[in-house]
From Swiss-Prot:
Annotated stretches, region: Disordered: 1-25, 55-322, 434-455, 494-513
Keyword vocabulary terms for this entry: Coiled coil, Phosphoprotein, Viral RNA replication
Record region (L protein binding): 412-445
Subunit field text: Homotetramer. Interacts (via multimerization domain) with polymerase L; this interaction forms the polymerase complex. Interacts (via N-terminus) with N0; this interaction allows P to chaperon N0 before encapsidation and form the N-P complex. Interacts (via C-terminus) with N-RNA template; this interaction positions the polymerase on the template.
Protein name per Swiss-Prot or TrEMBL: Phosphoprotein
UniProt family annotation: Belongs to the respirovirus P protein family.
Gene behind this protein: P/C
Region annotated Multimerization, chain positions: 344-411
Organism: Human parainfluenza 1 virus (strain CI-5/73)
Function noted in UniProt: Essential cofactor of the RNA polymerase L that plays a central role in the transcription and replication by forming the polymerase complex with RNA polymerase L and recruiting L to the genomic N-RNA template for RNA synthesis. Also plays a central role in the encapsidation of nascent RNA chains by forming the encapsidation complex with the nucleocapsid protein N (N-P complex). Acts as a chaperone for newly synthesized free N protein, so-called N0, allowing encapsidation of nascent RNA chains during replication.
Low complexity compositional bias, start-end: 294-304
Domain notes: The N-terminus consists of a long intrinsically disordered tail. The central part contains the coiled-coil multimerization domain (PMD). Forms a four-stranded coiled coil structure. The C-terminus constitutes the alpha-helical domain that binds to the nucleocapsid (N-RNA complex).
Biological-process GO terms, alphabetical: DNA-templated transcription; viral genome replication
Ranges annotated as biased composition (Polar residues): 191-216, 441-450
């Protein structure tokens, strides 16, 4: 932390006090002479002036007890030490020479002024009140340079090391605390000392010089509480780190709690003890043991009460996420995307898994992460389906082309087979029609293969035979058919018309024949009459049986009488 930046943040209240605090160089030189004139034995033995100041401050002890809460708040936490360790390390390397000289002057001024004002009625509550109001937000660069430990047998060592510590304080060098490790330049030694780092008495901050006063019982309690080990705070930091490493769901809530704790540590006032205060504080370790117990119990209660709202919120989020997952499964079942709700819960497809994670996410960061994963998985699945469809279309196109080629070849083959079948049918037809013979089947005579001009075919002349007229052209027919046809000597004109129609040629209609047409017309007249069907058949039969015109006339007269009887 830069020194100029630190002085730019001073309060107007502190600026008003600076003219009073800046004293001449002669006072500082006088203070150095007084301190150097003491012998080590005198410094170790004579402590009557310390006891006199403590007795004077006992008169105002009830007023000091009113600020117990403020003293508890003045105790620094490991988060403060870890927070300010890196800043103090950086600033110590950059401006070490300036800060040490300036801090030595102010430190000597404060000690000299405290020795002169030793008879003040109530120095500590006034200083504590000023410290509470000013509220130092950041640590000074010269603070927390070395570790501290719990003092146990320090009364014996105080007398031995008092001379050395006094000289170090006057010279401005950082002292080495009893039972503590020596100074180390690396940052890890300062950050990992579990809150045991101790602020040196030399500081350049003008706002906190009032704190460096003569010791009092209340200030000793604060020093003891600072030097006390706090395993509960270590456990709290460990549990916080484990929570952030194990589960990402509690990340946002743990950040909020850590930010809140940093804010509290920044706004809490700080008390910087001096060497004399630390020496007197060792004598009252047993007296203030109960107070340190009370503070550690409070710290335990605070640490126990912190993670409970986080677990409650996560439980509520899990309950709501389960209901949202169930609602999503029901919606998918109703839309027909999946068959059952159980199938959605057991499904291992990427989009379904990301959807379930998104519905169960605790904050917006995880929700957006899972939403992006779901969209990418859906896009990937769609691309896979598109590729599958493309391959299927290619296969179908190839099959269509091959089927076209097959159809073309098959049609050509079919045409060839059809032509062969037609040729075979034509040859079979010729063979069956001629009976296996190429010539005329009716011609039984043998015809010469070569015709000459000199020869002509002679027509065979048949002599007249009177029996040929009776036989007609039936000389080759069998006797049964001939006998059947010759048996009917009576010529029936109706039967003759019916039988001779298929054999009649076109020239036969030119010959006048009155009977055929009259019988046909009479038949049509009888069929169109209103008589019954049986009567019509009877009249037609009688017409066919008529042999002369007179019989036909008689039949038609009877027909007319029946028609007249029906009409009348």
């Amino acid at each position: 932390m830069d020194q100029d930046a630190f002085f730019s943040e001073r309060d107007p209240e502190a600026e008003g006090e600076t003219p009073r605090k800046q004293e001449s160089l002669s006072d500082v030189i006088g203070l150095l002479d007084v301190v150097l004139s003491y012998k080590p034995t005198e410094i170790g033995e004579d402590r009557s002036w310390l006891h006199s100041i403590i007795d004077n401050s006992k008169e105002n002890k009830p007023s000091c007890k009113a600020d117990d809460n403020n003293k508890d708040r003045a105790i620094s936490t490991p988060t403060q030490d870890h927070r300010s360790s890196e800043e103090s390390g950086i600033s110590r390397r950059t401006g070490e020479s300036k800060t040490e000289t300036h801090a030595r002057i102010l430190d000597q001024q404060g000690i000299h002024r405290a020795s002169r004002r030793g008879t003040s009625p109530n120095p500590l509550p006034e200083n504590m009140g000023n410290e509470r109001n000013t509220r130092i937000d950041e640590d000074s660069p010269n603070e927390r340079r070395h570790q501290r430990s719990v003092p146990t047998d320090e009364d014996r060592k105080m007398a031995e090391n008092s001379n050395k510590r006094e000289e170090d304080q006057v010279e401005g060098f950082p002292e080495e605390v009893r039972r503590g490790t020596p100074l180390s330049d690396d940052r890890e030694g300062r950050t990992n000392n579990n809150g045991r780092s101790m602020e040196t008495s030399s500081t350049h901050s003008t706002r906190i010089t009032d704190v460096i006063t003569n010791p009092s019982p209340e200030l000793e309690d604060a020093v003891l509480q600072r030097n006390k080990r706090r395993p509960t705070t270590i456990k709290r930091s460990q549990t916080r780190s484990e929570r952030t490493q194990n589960s990402e769901l509690h990340k946002s809530t743990s950040e909020d709690s850590s930010n809140l704790e940093d804010h509290n540590t920044k706004t809490s006032p700080k008390v910087l003890p001096s060497k004399n205060e630390e020496s007197v504080a060792t004598q009252k370790n047993n007296h203030n043991h109960r107070k340190t117990k009370y503070t550690t119990n409070n710290a335990n209660n605070n640490t126990k009460s912190l993670p409970t709202p986080e677990h409650d919120t996560t439980a509520n989020e899990e309950g709501t996420s389960n209901t949202s997952v169930d609602e999503m499964a029901k919606l998918l079942v109703s839309l027909g995307v999946i068959k059952s709700q159980h199938e959605f819960e057991l499904s291992r497809s990427a989009s379904h898994v990301f959807a379930k994670r998104m519905l169960k996410s605790a904050n917006y960061k995880e929700m957006t992460f899972n939403l992006c994963g779901m969209l990418l998985s859906v896009e990937k699945s769609l691309e896979n389906k598109v590729e599958e469809n493309r391959t299927l279309l290619k296969q179908i196109q190839e099959e269509i082309d091959s089927s076209r080629d097959l159809h073309k070849r098959f049609s050509e083959y079919q045409k060839e087979q059809n032509s062969l079948m037609m040729a075979n049918l034509s040859t079979l037809h010729i063979i069956t029609d001629r009976g296996g013979k190429t010539g005329d089947p009716s011609d039984t005579t043998r015809s010469p293969s070569v015709f000459t001009k000199g020869k002509d075919n002679k027509v065979k002349k048949t002599r007249f035979d009177p029996s040929m007229e009776a036989l007609g052209g039936q000389e080759f027919k069998p006797d049964l058919i001939r006998e059947d046809e010759l048996r009917d000597d009576i010529r029936n004109p109706v039967l003759e018309e019916h039988n001779n129609e298929p054999q009649a040629s076109n020239a036969s209609r030119l010959i006048p024949s009155t009977e055929k047409h009259t019988l046909h017309s009479l038949k049509l007249v009888i069929e169109n009459s209103p008589l019954s069907r049986v009567e019509k058949k009877a009249y037609i039969k009688s017409l066919y049986k008529c042999r002369t015109n007179q019989e036909v006339k008689n039949v038609m007269e009877l027909f007319e009488e029946d028609i007249d009887s029906l009409t009348n």
